[in-house]
């Protein structure tokens, strides 16, 4: 038997419950946010920094930088993340022109006769 006044025994279950509840809430948060919702949020962030003829530099600790860091660089202007492609085309910081395209990649459906 353990003594009832042992402090380590009293605090251990509380810490375990705290970790468990944090893990559960994190899992619930991830389940509620779809890829489409994340892309919509990314679009809003891009427009706020680069849209309407303005160019706001992006700091390394910004929300937009963190979101863009999830994309995999495949070419100097082309990034991918899950089912999405992100294109920065003809973008120039000097004359502040160009465009950004976010595209959702669709699965190809193969028909029985090989027609796509």
Swiss-Prot record:
* Domain of life per record: Bacteria
State one Pfam family annotation.
Answer: DUF5503
- Name it: Uncharacterized protein YedM
Organism for this UniProt entry? Escherichia coli (strain K12)
């Amino acid at each position: 038997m353990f003594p009832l006044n042992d402090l380590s025994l009293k605090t251990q279950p509380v810490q375990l419950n705290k970790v468990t509840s944090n893990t559960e809430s994190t899992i619930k948060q991830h389940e509620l946010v779809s890829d489409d919702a994340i892309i919509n949020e990314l679009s809003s962030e891009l427009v706020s920094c680069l849209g309407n003829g303005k160019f706001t530099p992006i700091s390394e600790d910004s929300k937009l930088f963190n979101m863009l860091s999830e994309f995999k660089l495949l070419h100097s202007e082309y990034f991918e993340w899950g089912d999405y492609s992100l294109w920065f085309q003809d973008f120039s910081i000097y004359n502040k022109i160009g465009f950004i395209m976010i595209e959702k990649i669709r699965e190809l459906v193969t028909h029985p006769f090989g027609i796509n």
